[in-house]
Curated annotation (Swiss-Prot):
Chief place where the protein resides: periplasm
Protein name in the entry: Outer-membrane lipoprotein carrier protein
Phylogenetic lineage: Bacteria, Pseudomonadati, Pseudomonadota, Gammaproteobacteria, Legionellales
Signal peptide boundaries: 1-26
Keywords assigned: Chaperone, Periplasm, Protein transport, Signal, Transport
Length: 211
């Protein structure tokens, strides 16, 4: 399973800055939905490490992520291989730089979870799609989201850690019992981003495969 592709469908729901420390007594789903209105853009560098079911490291990568509401993502992996994933909310591009190959496909609008539906920030939608709990500490909070659709989404749960009012870590456990941890740094919220960052125009020599 490609954890990066799962995150493309999920990341937009989480990229915002907290307006304050989260209260344990408040409803986690409502808090998460309310916080969606706090961001327009998000930029960060990331480091990823993936463990198998025996806690052995099976993958490491790093790069950067950019998001602009509604529905626009750019995920660049620099190592171990260079890959760029872009969506403008309508089309999804996956560009493997070393192979000079890109795949192009429509971004599904009828699937149960996709960036457009998650970015809506609707409490009703969140409750339909996830069971959400929260574990607060004096200076941080962690949300856990368990999909109500079960194994059809290829992951068991996702956890989001917020420190100093920003999302700093994301953990995904997939159905193969592989755990991927993404740590975010050099975070910028609501800084200007050009819409051209979320469009892909292949240069000459790039093989384009349409799906």
């Amino acid at each position: 399973m490609n954890t990066i592709k799962i995150l493309i469908g999920l990341l937009g729901i989480f990229l915002f800055s907290l307006s304050g420390i989260v209260s344990a007594q408040s409803d986690a789903t409502t808090q998460l939905s309310q916080l969606l209105s706090n961001f327009r853009t998000y930029q960060a560098k990331f480091n990823q490490i993936t463990f198998d079911g025996q806690d052995r490291v099976i993958q490491q990568s790093h790069g950067r992520v950019m998001i602009m509401r509604p529905g626009r993502f750019r995920w660049e992996t620099d190592s171990p291989t260079k890959q760029i994933i872009i969506t403008n909310g309508k089309t999804l591009w996956v560009y493997d730089v070393d192979l000079s190959q890109a795949t192009q496909q429509p971004l599904a609008q009828k699937t149960n979870i996709n960036p457009a539906s998650l970015l809506s920030g609707s409490v009703k939608d969140l409750k339909q799609k996830f069971t959400i709990t929260i574990s607060p500490t004096p200076d941080a909070a962690t949300f856990q989201l368990v999909p109500n659709l079960g194994k059809s989404l290829n992951f068991n749960w996702i956890r989001l850690k917020f420190s100093k009012k920003q999302l700093t870590e994301m953990t995904v456990l997939n159905n193969l019992d592989e755990r991927s941890i993404f740590q975010f740094s050099q975070i910028k919220v609501n800084a200007p981003l050009s819409s051209t960052l979320f469009e892909f125009k292949p240069s000459r020599g790039i093989d384009v495969v349409k799906q």
